[in-house]
Amino acid sequence: AKAIVKNEAELRERVKWVVNSYQQPALVETFLSGREFTVGVMGRADAKLYSRHPEWYDDKDGFHRFPILELDASRSVTPHVYSQAAKAKNVGEKGAPDYFCPAEVEPELEKKLKHFAYRAHILLNALDVSRTDIRLDDEGNPRLIEINTLPGLTPDYSDLCLQAAAEGIAYNDLLLDILYLAAGRWGL
């Protein structure tokens, strides 16, 4: 991807291009070379009262954490970057990232990633459902890429739907629970 630069000359050239193309400052971040994950969170403190599947939700905080999905973009059309071009590919198609759900992670890392996603959801006051994208830094520490407060819901394609399917949650049940949670917020 052109957005990844390897030296100061490339950085200066790319920043100049961004500033000239978009007529605004450029954001420069350190590239995180570690594994990439996405973690879905659904619910709220009273989720069990509105859900058709109260057993999905944690007794302590009312949230459901979906299985962790790992994205491996090393063989995608944009190696090592989960770009729009890579996302546009269908699961399993040549040039698409590889998806592993549930991801094979150590129990301690699983706990960290799920807590990280939960905290991001809470801190942003997200409603009902969100999906947090996380990458590990060179020391293996989780770092926030972004939080999606309106995650995609395309069946057999969108990350949250792949996570739900990995634990046996039917697509219709996922959608209905999101709708029931939203309706409950409005007293419906």
Language model segments and positions:
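ATP-dependent carboxylate activation and anion-phosphoryl transfer catalytic cores
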Residues: E104-L188
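A conserved helix-loop-beta module that forms one wall/lid of the active-site cleft
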Residues: A1-I4
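Phosphate-binding site of ATP-dependent enzymes
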Residues: K6-H115, N141-R143
